[in-house]
Each structure stands twice: as structure tokens, then as C-alpha cells.
């Protein structure tokens, strides 16, 4: 059905209004810029996943597909003007399985992870990610390990299987032991699953600390600008000879060392680090 002339004029006016409003909001409203940037960030990842799926599908579900995802995601930091500095990469054990533990601040953690991700390393993620459209399918093809955190028995069973996989397939896993994104500019208490996994498999733990994003990103303040982030790889922590009884002390010791480094690298060159006292940075 043909539109009457007035409707065409109305559509044209709405189009012109959008052309005017969007740039105005972009330059005049930090909150609008925040929402635009986050929408593009998530949408772009979903689009890249669509491109990655047919390439990864050639191998099927395979940890080597993580190299493809990493290659496709590395450029995102340039789109947002974020400089990622990596220090301590020589601490990665060269030829053995291990468990990476890292602090968890925001969905932007993906940028730091892709920058430093070692070979044959896959994250352990919450099962909900599996249903995140193209991103979920791409992650499944890349060997990401999904855990239903609400079903403790299933999670323990999966961790036992992962321990065997570490040893038999020379795989490394990346775990966020806080269990959820942290909004308070510090570190939440660590859940012990990653440490039980490392002790069960008798493999080292490699702590990785990402500095605070508060100088360029804050969900609570609706602020997202350009900036820099430091990713620090700490020396591996051996677990040989440890038993499940040693896990609580091990988790506390690793968290303490990571928190010390987090405070150090989050205040270095950032005006004394007052923003570390502000809650609400995650997202």
C-alpha cells in the first residue's frame, strides 16, 4: 500500500531529526555516549561471532578455535582508544597445564583477556552465556567450559572432568574466582572452585591482575572514555603436594597477592587512585 504524501514527509522529518539528535547527544551527553558505546561493544561482538562461527565449525568444538576468536577481538581496544599494557607475560609456564585466576570488573575484561590469553587456554563461564546468541555458539565451538553455578553438584562434576582434561589434553583454564563482576573498586572474596581444581590436578595457579578501569569507565556514572589498562601476570603458585585442606589458605594467599598488585597498578600514574574508593565501576 502506497504511503500518502504526508507520511513520506513525516518519515523524512523523523530521519532528519535523528541525524541532528544523535550527533548532539554524542557530543553533549556523556550518558548517551556511554549507552551508544556499550550497545556497539556488545553488538559488534555478536557480529564478529557470526563471522567466526563458520570458520570455527570446520574443526568442531576445539580449544584451538580460541585463537580465531582472539584474533577477531584484538582490534576492539583500538576502536575505543584503550591502551592495554601487559607486564610479566614471561611468568606463564611454557609447556604445562595450569589454572589462570583473574579479577573480574566488567564485560571490558574481555579486552585484557584477549591481549594476554596464552595458547590452549579457555575460560570457565556461567552457563547463561551459552544462550547469548552467536556469542554463545562461538564460545562453545572454542571449547569454553560452561558451569551452572546454581547446581552445585553439576559444577563439582564438571570441575572434576576439567581436572582430567588439563592433564590429558594439555589445556589451561581461565577462571574469575570472584564469581561475579565486582563493583566496589577492590576484590570480592574468592570462591574456591579454581583452587580445588588446581590442587586436584596438581598444576600451578597463574594469577593475573587487571588494573581498575575507573579512569575511563564507570557504569554507575555512565562514563566511558578512552584510557589505559595494565595487565600484570604474577609468578605461578605451585600446588604440588597440597591437599583439599590447604585450599582455603591457598585461596586467601593468592587473593592477598593479587589485591596488593591491584592497588599498586591502579594508583600508578592515575592521580593517587582516589577513584578506587568509588563503588559502581563494574558493568
UniProtKB/Swiss-Prot annotation:
CDD domains: LPLAT_AGPAT-like (cd07989). Pfam families: Acyltransferase. A motif (HXXXXD motif) lies at residues 104-109. Residues 27-37, 149-283 are lumenal. Residues 59-127 are cytoplasmic. Residues 1-26 form the signal peptide. It is a multi-pass membrane protein. It catalyses: a 1-acyl-sn-glycero-3-phosphate + an acyl-CoA = a 1,2-diacyl-sn-glycero-3-phosphate + CoA; 1-(9Z-octadecenoyl)-sn-glycero-3-phosphate + (9Z)-octadecenoyl-CoA = 1,2-di-(9Z-octadecenoyl)-sn-glycero-3-phosphate + CoA; 1-(9Z-octadecenoyl)-sn-glycero-3-phosphate + hexadecanoyl-CoA = 1-(9Z)-octadecenoyl-2-hexadecanoyl-sn-glycero-3-phosphate + CoA; heptadecanoyl-CoA + 1-(9Z-octadecenoyl)-sn-glycero-3-phosphate = 1-(9Z)-octadecenoyl-2-heptadecanoyl-sn-glycero-3-phosphate + CoA. The keyword Transcription regulation does not apply. Widely expressed. Expressed in adipose tissue and at high levels in testis and pancreas. Expressed at lower levels in tissues such as heart, brain, placenta, kidney, lung, spleen, thymus, prostate, ovary, intestine, colon, leukocyte and liver. Pathway: Phospholipid metabolism; CDP-diacylglycerol biosynthesis; CDP-diacylglycerol from sn-glycerol 3-phosphate: step 2/3. Keywords: Acyltransferase, Endoplasmic reticulum, Lipid biosynthesis, Lipid metabolism, Membrane, Phospholipid biosynthesis, Phospholipid metabolism, Signal, Transferase, Transmembrane, Transmembrane helix. GO terms for molecular function: 1-acylglycerol-3-phosphate O-acyltransferase activity. Its EC number is 2.3.1.51. One of its GO terms (biological process) is phospholipid metabolic process. The chain crosses the membrane at residues 38-58, 128-148. It comes from the Eukaryota. GO terms for cellular component: endoplasmic reticulum; endoplasmic reticulum membrane; membrane. Its main location: endoplasmic reticulum. NCBIfam families: AGP_acyltrn. PANTHER family: 1-ACYL-SN-GLYCEROL-3-PHOSPHATE ACYLTRANSFERASE, 1-ACYL-SN-GLYCEROL-3-PHOSPHATE ACYLTRANSFERASE ALPHA. Converts 1-acyl-sn-glycerol-3-phosphate (lysophosphatidic acid or LPA) into 1,2-diacyl-sn-glycerol-3-phosphate (phosphatidic acid or PA) by incorporating an acyl moiety at the sn-2 position of the glycerol backbone. The HXXXXD motif is essential for acyltransferase activity and may constitute the binding site for the phosphate moiety of the glycerol-3-phosphate. Belongs to the 1-acyl-sn-glycerol-3-phosphate acyltransferase family. This is 1-acyl-sn-glycerol-3-phosphate acyltransferase alpha. It comes from Homo sapiens (Human).
